[in-house]
Design a protein with these regions (language model features):
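N-terminal membrane-targeting/pre-transmembrane regions
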Residues: 1-34, 116-118, 126, 130-133
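Juxtamembrane cytosolic interface motif at the C-terminal end of transmembrane helices
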Residues: 32-35, 55-57
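Short, aromatic-rich membrane-interface segments at the entry and exit
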Residues: 36-45
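Transmembrane-cytosolic junction motif
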Residues: 51-68, 72-73
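Non-transmembrane, membrane-adjacent beta-strand/coil modules in membrane-associated proteins
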Residues: 58, 72-135
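Generic alpha-helical hydrophobic packing signal
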Residues: 67-68, 78, 124, 147-153
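C-terminal/domain-terminus segments
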Residues: 134-153
Length: 153
């Protein structure tokens, strides 16, 4: 395996979305603390959990090497797909991620696909393997598929 990826893409969540999530979680932690009086630990717990979730899903990173495709979400999730198992790749426009997958992130779709999607990125590739069909977010789906096809040939 070469150390440099043939194709690489980083998809970050937009900052207003993160700010909204953080403010919502802070309010959920702060309001009960104020009402119940002095439960500062509840606010600290919600804040820590929110920061952990944001760090875990802030960035989706896609790297294609000669022998494998690696998709990483934050610090904890990593999916490896061997190039030899890839059958077909095509650009794909997600019509409605909330309806099909119930949101963004790591999801199983109602249509049987396995989605690895980033918030507010509706362009993707559809990657077929013998076991599963993956939908992977990409801001440049044509380039991503071209890179996969060049590695396959």
């Amino acid at each position: 395996m070469s150390s440099m990826p043939i194709y690489e893409e980083r998809l970050n969540v937009n900052y207003p979305f993160i700010g909204g999530i953080f403010l919502f979680a802070l309010a959920v932690g702060l309001i009960p603390s104020i009402i119940l009086g002095g439960l500062w630990w509840l606010t600290a717990l919600y804040t820590a959990l929110t920061i952990g979730i944001i760090v875990s899903f802030f960035q989706m990173r896609v790297e294609l090497f000669e022998d494998k495709l690696i998709i990483k979400f934050g610090l904890f999730y990593r999916k490896v797909i061997e190039v030899e198992k890839m059958q077909d790749c095509s650009p794909y426009k997600m019509p409605h991620p909330m309806r099909t997958y119930g949101g963004w992130g790591i999801r199983k779709g109602r249509d049987g696909t396995f989605a690895l999607t980033q918030a507010f990125v509706n362009e993707a590739i559809k990657l077929e393997t013998p076991e599963k069909t993956f939908v992977i977010s990409s801001r440049r789906p044509e380039s991503f598929c071209s890179a996969i096809k060049s590695v396959k040939s």
